[in-house]
Design a protein with these regions (language model features):
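Terminal alpha-helical segments
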Residues: 1-120
């Protein structure tokens, strides 16, 4: 597969994550589950940018590491989703989100737009 094909495959998964995030904006939906899905979307978007640089992304959930490899500066709020990769899944909370769901979703969608433009 070409880098663009690999990136498109990842973008399909991100679109599924974004649908889940949009459907779970209700504050009754657990922050830990919403944050995990948001973290996964950001992780995959960064991996899209890494793949488009014709590099193989590492098997890592560390957003700051992936952002460095993708040569992208992530907003602080998106970096704040790192907790949801592992800690919020296996430790007792609460784990409050680093910003409102709407703000986080907006920032994730901006990163998605960046990826779509990079694919061309």
């Amino acid at each position: 597969m070409s880098p663009a094909d690999d990136a498109s495959l990842l973008l399909g998964l991100v679109q599924r994550h974004l649908r889940s995030l949009r459907l779970s904006l209700d504050p009754q939906f657990p922050d830990e589950d919403w944050g995990f899905t948001a973290q996964q979307a950001v992780e995959k978007l960064l991996k899209v940018l890494i793949v488009l640089r014709d590099q193989r992304p590492p098997r890592s959930h560390e957003l700051s590491e992936l952002a460095a490899l993708a040569e992208v500066e992530l907003p602080t709020q998106l970096l704040g989703l790192q907790t949801y990769a592992v800690e919020a899944r296996y430790e007792e909370g609460p784990f409050p989100l680093p910003a409102t769901r709407e703000k986080l979703l907006e920032e994730i969608e901006q990163l998605l737009d960046c990826c779509i433009k990079a694919i061309g």
